[in-house]
Structures are given as C-alpha cells and as structure tokens.
C-alpha cells in the first residue's frame, strides 16, 4: 500500500482527493524533517541563542542592561508593573496573598504543589525529577521525541508529566517574589531552570514530544522571566541560558507544528500562539519576526476554522472551549498592548466566545463539562478546577465593558462560583486599572434561554431554573476527538443545586477502561438502545470517536412563558433493526418544570434504557409512588422525576412498563479526580415505535411538595393531551 492509500485510510470523515493528496505530501515532509532533526540532535543542544546581528555583537553586560531598560515590548500589565500589582494584591486580596506565599514556600523548599485534580504532589526533595510520572512513578525515557509511545497501558499518563513540565509553578514563584522581594525565590527559579535543561536535552524525551506542551511551557517561562528580570540573580550567564532556551523552544515548535490539512485542533492553536508570544516578547531573537508574523496569521486563521459562527469551539467540548478562549484572549491582549492590530472581526469573534461561556454557566456559576476536559490552562495564575470558567468572564467583562459578563461570574445568590474569587487573573493580566474598570461595571439583566445552533447547544432557563440540551456532533466537523457519546443528553439545575450533570472525563491514557466509560452513552443523560454506543468507539483509540449520531435540531421555539426544543439523532440506525431517537423538551416557565419526551421509531423489539446522570453528593431514592427523588441535604432542594405514561396507557398496568433502578456511577469535575454518583435508569424491552415522557419538577426548600407536584403533573398531563 503506497503512502497516499495509507493516508486516505487513516483520515477520518469526508476527505476529498485534493485534501488527501495535500495531507499525504505534508506527512512525507514530516518524515524527511524528522530524519534531519534526529541527525542534528547534538548541534541543536550546543547551538547558542540565535540573536539578531545588532544584539549578537554587543557585550553580555550590555545585553542584560538592554533587557532591564527596554520599554517595548510589554508583557501583560500586571506582570509588567509588578511592584504596583504586588501592592494591590496585598491590599485587595489579603487571604489569597497568604495562600500564594504559602504555595511559593512549598514550591521552593519542598518542591510540592497542586497537580490537576490529584491534589498536592511532591516531585523530588533534593532535585525535581522532570521525566518521572509522579503518580505511576514511571520514568519516561530520553529517546528521540517522535519515537516515544504515549500509550503504554501501564498506568502512566503523559498528560500528568506534561502538566509538571509546563512550569506554571514558576509563575507562582515569580508572583511571590514581586510581593516579598525574597531573593531565595529567584535562586530557586534558576536552580529549577538549570535542572530542567540538564534533564531535558532538546528534542529528546516526553517533554519535547508534543509541540503544544513546548508552546505552553514557553508562555509560562515568558511570564516568569518578566517577574524575575529585575532580580540580582539575573546575571549575564543566566540571561544567555534563558535566551537559548526560548530560541530552542521556538525552533522546536516551528519544526514540529501539529498541523493537518484535514483538521486542526487546540494543539496547533497552542503551537502558533506560542510562536506569537515568543516573537512578540523576544524581538532580539533572529527568528522572532518570522515567528510573530506566522503566529498571528495562523492564530487568526485558526479562529476562522475552529470557532463556530455562534462562538463555540468546534471540538464539542466546553473544557477545550475554555482553553482556546484563554489562548485567543491572552494573545489578543498581548498584541493590543504592543501595538499589533487585530481586525474588528476577530474581536467580535472573541466576544462571541465569551458570550457562549456566559450562556452555558449554570446558576451555581459552574460549567457543564460537555465532552473532554483535561483541566488545561494557559497561564494558571490561579489553578482552576475543570468546571471553573467564571474567571474568563471577568476578563471578558472588562475587555468588552459588558456588565452581563460580570454578573455571570457569580452564582444566582451573588456568591463567587464555587466560593473561588475570579479577579486574580484580572489583576495580573489587565493590571490594577483593569481591575478598577471591572469593579466599576454595574447593571445587568438575568440570563435567559438561548440557542447555539452551530454548536448544537440549547439552554432553557429562567431565574434559578436551568436545563441544557446537547445536540452537538462528535466535534471537529464530525471527525471526533474530544466529543462524547452524549447526543440529546441534558443537564438540570434548580434551587441553587446542580442535579443532573455530565460526568466529565476523569483521565485519558492512564486507564483506557475509565477513559471510555466516562465518554460512553451509559454515562450520559440520554437514551441507550440495545446497550449500543451512539457513536462507534475503538478500545485502543482514546481520541477517536465516530459521528454516526449526527444530531439534527427539528424545532426551537423560545418564549416568554415556555420554551420548546426538538432534536433527533441517528446513532442507532446502524443496528440490525435501525432505530431513530427523537427527544422533545418543553420548559414551562410559569409552573416551573420541564417535560421530556423520548420517541424511539423503527422496527422490531429492543432493550431501551432512559437515564439521568446525577451529581455527586446527592441522596437519591425510588419512592413507593415510583417517583425518583433526588435531594440536596445541604439546602433542602429536591428534584422529582416522574415517569408519565402516554395518554392511552394511563391507569393501566402493562407488561412492558418501565423498570426503575439506581445504578452506581462516578463523576469527575477535574482531571484525575472522581467521586461516586448515581444514575437513575428506566428500562424496558419493547416493540417499536415507543415513547416515554418524564416530568422533571424542582421543589425548593420552602416550597410545598404536594402543591408543586400536583400543579406540575396537571399541567404536564394537559400538555400531553395537546400532543
């Protein structure tokens, strides 16, 4: 089989002949480029920083003086004016400052800090072991980066060691130094940089395997470099070593761009953002101008490709929407403060991305974890849980002077989302003036029902009531990667509690069984037929998912007193006896309940399971009257899920009535963390066509259940009679 035929076989989705040919040629070029890179490893490590001629010929002391005195380029205002920012940090955020300094102390003295959802980890008391997975204790080899197999099936997880090697903890050290002027912090910074360089020769090992990781590491190093530049510990030798490291990072990204003519993703976006940042902030490097121009051009082209018309990320993932929004937003701000023009069209697209976040945040201020999430952040000024997206709203509120975005950073009760302050990033990215601008924003209107038709996301909400319908495809124009088997799945929040939730992701390659479990149909609040997956999944391929479901929205009718959305998917059409699933969701805003109707059409007899995945920490029981009751013991709120028999079955006890059970599950709100949860399942073996209807009725703490249940059921029955 020739390389063209091989490429055609492995490319997923519809690929025309021209695109397949271009991709074939690109892959041939990659093969040749890697041969050259492999042959030049020694030279790549020995080569000094390639400086522009006017900087290459000056003395090292003059070069250091130049960096300390230069006015342009500028990093983010909070970093650039670190003394002012540090004073504001102490005065405005005293509790956060205490935590920051405590974290910096642990990082410097014991090499310990939080790692994703795994909690605090220590990485070597004497010297950090940069290539050791701190969970499995596997030592990644220093093989040529492209030879490393990331799928080992031994519990090791490249994502974990990559997080360590993004070096974001060095930004914590730098912020603490800005506040304390403690010279032990820059000493620790330089020791860790020297240690990292010694253990990670260029293009060798897992930490050079993925250009995205190289780019994110460079971004964090630029932030730390800005904060430590004024330290006496920054001498001529240290500067020379850092410039060499930045040049190596930029050159490696350029040699190993994660581009494809078929589809690009967050990886390529991070690659080009990394080149843009290095190019903007280090014009002294000979390659900087080319990196800056290429990075900006590609960044904007990727916004055209990867951001849908309604502002949503095209990878069918709210987690990667957050990451991409950070990449675009921070890059746009960096360009703006350095006089680099970005067309208004792209600022409008950026605003649309922020609008999407504002719409999908639940009343508790948390994000629904649709699709994959690895908890990734660009500059983790504060390490945020995977479902914490409110801080990007704070940045968006200030940039676009939009009070609605500011209102979205708080819960419906006026508290910070999850009790975590959202202004830290504001202060360090936009500076003290940005924080003042944010604080001056007043006035807003409550969020309302909203459709994101391109993304396939529909939000039916009023006051404390929130239901999200997911009618998205598997992502990347149907090619899949970070999508889940969640077609027509729902999320429900009411009375200040998230009741029905997406399960999240948990882990990727560390455990393929859990990886597939968390993205399975059975783990989502939708209907499963004959135990089949909505989209095909390959057990050995954790980042491939089919697009057989192809959800289609039939109707969307928002209104003052009621909302309606109707959608269907075709994932079960590939069964021996094909089945189509149509879901209709009605939101009665007056009587405060939702009615969900599932219609299964086709031929033959099938096993059908209607599930809702419930949030952890709730008490769930099946009552004697058949109602599933979900209770939040903390605030007294309950959610009642009532199976409504079709009109012709009311009052009857029939052989194929639904059996209700509670199934043990897990939920993950952060990469690497999981908690026990429950799914309620109504199952039946029945001939098709078949329909089932469920009334979802919230009862807040001070409400009378009998009155709420009676009025909602009467209204639901009336609605069913009309249908």
Go through each PLM region and give its residues.
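Aromatic-lined, polymer-binding surfaces characteristic
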Residues: 137-361, 366, 374
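Carbohydrate-active enzyme catalytic cores, enriched for enzymes
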Residues: 312, 316-500, 555-558
């Amino acid at each position: 089989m020739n390389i063209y035929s091989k490429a055609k076989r492995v490319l997923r989705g519809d690929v025309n002949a021209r695109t397949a040919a271009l991709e074939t040629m690109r892959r041939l070029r990659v093969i040749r480029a890697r041969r050259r890179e492999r042959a030049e490893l020694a030279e790549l490590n020995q080569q000094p920083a390639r400086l522009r001629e006017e900087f290459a010929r000056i003395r090292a002391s003059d070069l250091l003086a130049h960096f300390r005195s230069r006015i342009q380029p500028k990093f983010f205002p909070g970093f650039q004016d670190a003394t002012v920012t540090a004073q504001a940090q102490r005065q405005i955020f005293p509790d956060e400052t205490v935590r920051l300094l405590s974290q910096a102390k642990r990082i410097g003295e014991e090499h310990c800090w939080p790692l994703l959802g795994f909690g605090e980890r220590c990485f070597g008391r004497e010297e950090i072991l940069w290539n050791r997975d701190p969970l499995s204790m596997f030592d990644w080899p220093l093989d040529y980066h492209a030879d490393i197999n990331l799928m080992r099936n031994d519990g090791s997880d490249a994502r974990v060691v990559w997080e360590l090697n993004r070096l974001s903890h060095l930004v914590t050290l730098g912020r603490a130094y800005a506040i304390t002027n403690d010279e032990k912090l820059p000493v620790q910074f330089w020791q860790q940089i020297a240690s990292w360089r010694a253990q990670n020769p260029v293009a060798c090992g897992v930490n050079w395997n993925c250009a995205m990781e190289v780019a994110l590491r460079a971004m964090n190093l630029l932030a730390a470099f800005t904060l430590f530049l004024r330290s006496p510990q920054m001498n001529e030798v240290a500067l020379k070593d850092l410039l060499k490291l930045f040049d190596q990072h930029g050159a490696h990204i350029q040699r190993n761009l994660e581009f494809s003519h078929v589809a690009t993703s967050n990886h390529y976006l991070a690659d080009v953002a990394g080149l843009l940042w290095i190019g903007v902030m280090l014009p002294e490097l000979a390659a900087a101008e080319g990196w800056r121009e290429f990075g900006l051009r590609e960044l904007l082209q990727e916004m055209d490709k990867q951001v849908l018309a309604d502002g949503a990320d095209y990878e069918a993932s709210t987690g990667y929407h957050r990451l991409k929004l950070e990449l675009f937003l921070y890059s746009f701000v960096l360009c703006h403060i350095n006089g680099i023009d970005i067309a208004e069209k792209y600022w409008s697209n950026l605003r649309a991305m922020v609008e999407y976040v504002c719409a999908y945040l639940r009343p508790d201020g948390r994000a629904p974890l649709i699709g994959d999430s690895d908890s990734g952040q660009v500059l983790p000024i504060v390490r945020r849980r995977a479902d914490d997206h409110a801080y990007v709203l704070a940045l968006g509120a200030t940039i676009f002077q939009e009070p609605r975005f500011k209102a979205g950073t708080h819960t419906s009760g006026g508290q910070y989302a999850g009790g975590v302050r959202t202004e830290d990033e504001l202060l360090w990215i936009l500076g003290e003036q940005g924080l003042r601008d944010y604080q001056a924003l007043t006035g807003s209107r409550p969020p309302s029902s909203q459709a994101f038709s391109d993304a396939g996301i529909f939000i039916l909400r009023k006051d404390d009531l929130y239901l999200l319908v997911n009618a998205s495809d598997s992502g990347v124009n149907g090619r899949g990667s970070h999508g889940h088997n969640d077609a027509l799945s729902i999320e429900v929040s009411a009375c200040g509690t998230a009741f029905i939730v997406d399960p999240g992701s948990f882990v990727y390659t560390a455990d393929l069984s859990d990886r597939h479990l968390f993205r399975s149909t059975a783990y989502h609040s939708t209907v499963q037929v004959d135990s089949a997956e909505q989209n095909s999944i390959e057990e050995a391929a954790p980042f491939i998912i089919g697009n057989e479901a192809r959800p289609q929205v039939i109707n969307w009718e928002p209104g003052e007193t009621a909302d309606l959305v109707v959608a269907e998917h075709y994932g079960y059409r590939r069964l021996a006896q094909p089945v189509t699933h149509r879901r209709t969701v009605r939101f009665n805003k007056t009587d405060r309940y939702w009615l969900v109707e599932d219609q299964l059409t086709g031929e033959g007899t099938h096993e059908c399971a209607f599930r809702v995945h419930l949030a952890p920490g709730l008490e769930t029981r099946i009552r004697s009257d058949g109602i599933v009751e979900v209770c939040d013991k903390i605030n007294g709120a309950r959610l009642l899920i009532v199976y409504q028999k079709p009109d012709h079955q009311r009052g009857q006890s029939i052989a194929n009535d639904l059996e209700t059970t509670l199934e043990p599950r897990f939920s993950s709100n952060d990469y690497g963390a999981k908690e026990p949860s429950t799914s309620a399942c109504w199952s039946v073996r029945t001939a098709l066509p078949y329909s089932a209807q469920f009334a979802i009725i919230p009862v807040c703490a001070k409400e009378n259940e009998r009155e709420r249940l009676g009025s909602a059921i009467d209204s639901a029955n009336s609605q069913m009679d009309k249908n």
